[in-house]
A protein has these predicted regions:
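Internal catalytic or translocation cores that form aromatic/hydrophobic pockets or channels
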Residues: 151-157
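His-Asp-centered metal-binding catalytic motifs of divalent-metal-dependent phosphohydrolases/nucleases
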Residues: 109-127, 137, 159-168
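N-terminal export leaders
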Residues: 12-34
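Divalent metal-dependent phosphate-bond-processing catalytic cores, especially two-metal-ion Mg2+/Mn2+ enzymes
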Residues: 21-29, 48-54, 79-85, 89-104, ...
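N-terminal secretory signal peptides
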Residues: 1-12
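C-terminal segment of N-terminal export signals and the immediately downstream linker at the start
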Residues: 31-65
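An active-site-proximal "capping" alpha-helix that borders the catalytic cofactor pocket
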Residues: 132-147
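Conserved N-terminal diphosphate/IPP-binding helix and adjacent helical/loop segment
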Residues: 58-73, 80-90
Length: 265
C-alpha cells in the first residue's frame, strides 16, 4: 500500500469527486442508453445496526421474500455497511423497473439475489490479492449460494451476472438476469438510463434506500482497490482513476503492453 499524507488523500478525494466518480466507466455505461437491455483494503466501514425487515415492494417492484432471498439479505447486511447495502438494493429495484416496463420475463429471485450480492468484492473480507473485484464478488456469492443449496446452474448464472456487471456491452447481450444487474448498478452509479424512471418513482426508491454518502464511499473503494492491488485493475475501467490520482501508479497502459510485447513489430 502506498503511503500518502492525510492532506494528499483529502485533495485526491476532492479531485475525483469534482470530476465525477463515473469518469472511469463513462465509455462502458454509455451503452445503457443504447443497448438492450486477501490484501487489506485502505478503508473498511463498519456495518451499523439496521432493521431486519424490508418493505414488501418499492415503487411497485416486489421484494422477494423467499428463504434464499432473506438469507442473501442477511449475508449482505452482515458484510457491508449501510451505504453499500442500499446501493445493491437500488440496483435490484432500478433493474426491475427498466425491465418490467419492457415486459421482459425473468427469474426475479435470481436477479434479486445477484443484485444483493453483486458488490461483495468491494468488501475487504472477500478480496483476494490478484482478482478483479467483480470476480472476487462472484466467487464469494457463488460459494454462499451453493452452501445454501441453490442449484449449480442458477449459482453459475449469478456468478456471470456479478462478474460481468461492469462490462455493460457484454452483459446487456446476455440473458435478462445477467443484464439487469449491470443495468441497475450502472443506473445507480452514474445515472445512465435515469430518464426512464419517473421522478415520483425515483423519490420512492431513494426514500426506501437512501444514497447518503454513496459517491464518497464509492470513490474511496475505487482508490482502495487501486492502491492495494493495482495490477488487478489492468485494463479495468477503474485504472484511469488510479493513474490520474495516485502518484507513481504502476499499472501500464494498453499501449505500454503492446510496445513491450516480445515481437519485432
Amino acid at each position: 500500500m502506498m503511503d500518502n499524507s492525510n492532506e494528499h488523500n483529502d485533495v485526491t478525494r476532492r479531485m475525483v469527486l469534482g470530476r465525477g466518480a463515473s469518469i472511469a466507466v463513462a465509455g462502458a455505461v454509455t451503452a445503457l442508453t443504447t443497448g438492450a437491455v486477501a490484501a487489506p483494503a485502505a478503508r473498511a466501514a463498519t456495518p451499523g445496526p439496521r432493521p431486519d425487515a424490508l418493505p414488501s415492494s418499492v415503487a411497485g417492484v416486489p421484494i422477494p421474500d423467499s428463504r434464499l432471498a432473506r438469507e442473501a439479505v442477511a449475508f449482505a447486511r452482515g458484510a457491508a455497511p449501510e451505504v453499500l447495502f442500499n446501493h445493491v438494493m437500488r440496483t435490484y429495484v432500478f433493474g426491475a423497473l427498466v425491465f418490467d416496463r419492457r415486459g421482459v420475463r425473468y427469474d426475479r429471485e435470481l436477479v434479486f439475489v445477484a443484485s444483493v450480492l453483486h458488490d461483495l468484492g468491494l468488501v475487504e473480507s472477500f478480496q483476494t490479492p490478484t482478482e478483479r473485484f467483480e470476480v472476487d464478488g462472484a466467487d464469494a456469492a457463488q460459494r454462499f449460494l451453493l452452501r445454501h443449496r441453490m442449484s449449480a446452474d442458477r449459482a453459475a448464472l449469478v456468478w456471470d451476472a456479478i462478474a460481468l456487471h461492469t462490462s455493460v456491452g457484454i452483459a446487456t447481450r446476455k440473458r435478462p438476469e445477467i443484464a439487469m444487474v449491470s443495468v441497475g448498478s450502472g443506473l445507480d452509479f452514474s445515472g445512465n438510463g435515469l430518464q426512464q424512471i419517473p421522478s415520483d418513482v425515483l423519490e420512492e426508491v431513494l426514500t426506501a434506500f437512501p444514497r447518503e454518502g454513496f459517491k464518497e464511499d464509492a470513490v474511496d473503494r475505487i482508490l482502495s482497490l487501486c492502491r492495494t492491488k493495482p495490477m488487478a485493475e489492468l485494463m479495468h475501467p477503474f485504472v484511469e482513476v488510479g493513474r490520474r490520482h495516485i502518484p507513481g501508479f504502476p499499472v501500464p497502459t494498453v499501449e505500454d503492453m503492446l510496445l513491450a510485447a516480445p515481437f519485432d513489430s
